[in-house]
Regions:
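Sec-dependent signal peptide recognition
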Residues: 1-7
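A cross-kingdom marker for long, charged
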Residues: 196-245
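Extended amphipathic alpha-helical interaction segments
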Residues: 121-190
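N-terminal signal peptide c-region/cleavage motif recognized by signal peptidases
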Residues: 13-15
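Short, low-complexity cationic-aromatic patches
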Residues: 65-71, 78, 161-168, 175, ...
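Extended intrinsically disordered, low-complexity coil regions enriched in Ser, Thr, Gly, Ala
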Residues: 78-102, 177-214
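Eukaryotic terminal intrinsically disordered regions
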Residues: 22-35, 39, 162-163, 167, ...
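N-terminal Sec/ER secretory leader and immediately downstream segment
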Residues: 19-128
Length: 245
């Protein structure tokens, strides 16, 4: 069995878990956002909401800059419209997610050039942001039972729901195999030393959750997005249940 963390910025193909790639799902087609054309409003918005651009860090690879851009953009959008962010976070795959993202993403959070992403990527970036914001200091843990991702997927066709559910069940397995490492990866900054260590540490947990004899290619963003989603859903449900007692 071989596990490879691929240095590919925006690829979402993992053969052993999800046979259907994002590229074959028309509802997850790439969206491109350009800066808002109203300069005065953009400047006002930028100072208030910290609109972002591609990071100009010579130490970061272009691939890492792309990963960081999605999370930075998601952070700005989350801060400016928490209600919209929650609608994206809670949307199931397919058309519901695309509609939520199209209504939510806007050029007021992007300063220069353009940013392109799939709806599933922006949702993943939002899960990173939301989990960090609420649970950076400590993971609340996991519910005794896995999340029902079939219910979240809803009534979309099997070609979409199968890969969606399989990937998140894979994430559940990784998180239960080593919660501390999953948490460390979810809260680490893009391309930081902490993230590099976390990716190294998480490899053994990934291996536990892949069938023997299979070779799997996992992108860094896919692992980070999936673990952040799994941890966030468990953490918020745990927090809600404790609040009701």
């Amino acid at each position: 069995m071989k596990i490879t963390l691929a240095l590919i910025a925006m690829s979402f193909s993992i053969p052993a878990v999800a046979q259907t790639s994002a590229a074959s799902d028309p509802s997850d087609a790439v969206i491109t956002i350009q800066p808002a054309t109203d300069t005065s409003y953009t400047e006002s918005f930028s100072s208030r909401r910290k609109a972002v651009a591609m990071r100009d860090d010579p130490k970061m690879s272009n691939l890492d800059k792309g990963r960081a851009a999605v999370v930075d953009f998601a952070q700005c959008l989350h801060d400016s419209d928490k209600g919209g962010a929650r609608r994206v976070l809670m949307s199931g795959p397919g058309a519901p997610l695309k509609s939520a993202v199209v209504a939510f993403a806007n050029g007021q959070c992007w300063l220069r050039g353009f940013i392109s992403f799939r709806p599933s990527a922006l949702q993943g970036g939002l899960f990173v942001v939301a989990y960090r914001n609420q649970f950076r200091s400590k993971s609340p843990g996991l519910l005794p039972e896995p999340i029902d991702y079939v219910k979240i997927a809803g009534t979309i066709n099997e070609a979409q729901s199968g890969p969606y559910v399989a990937l998140r069940r894979f994430g559940e397995c990784v998180a239960r195999s080593n919660l501390d490492v999953a948490h460390a990866l979810a809260i680490s900054d893009i391309a930081s030393n902490a993230e590099t260590r976390a990716f190294t540490d998480v490899s053994s947990a990934l291996s536990v959750c892949v069938d023997v004899g299979r070779s799997v290619m996992l992108t860094k963003e896919l692992v980070k997005y999936t673990l952040s989603e799994v941890l966030y859903r468990h953490a918020t449900q745990l927090a809600a249940s404790k609040g009701q007692k």
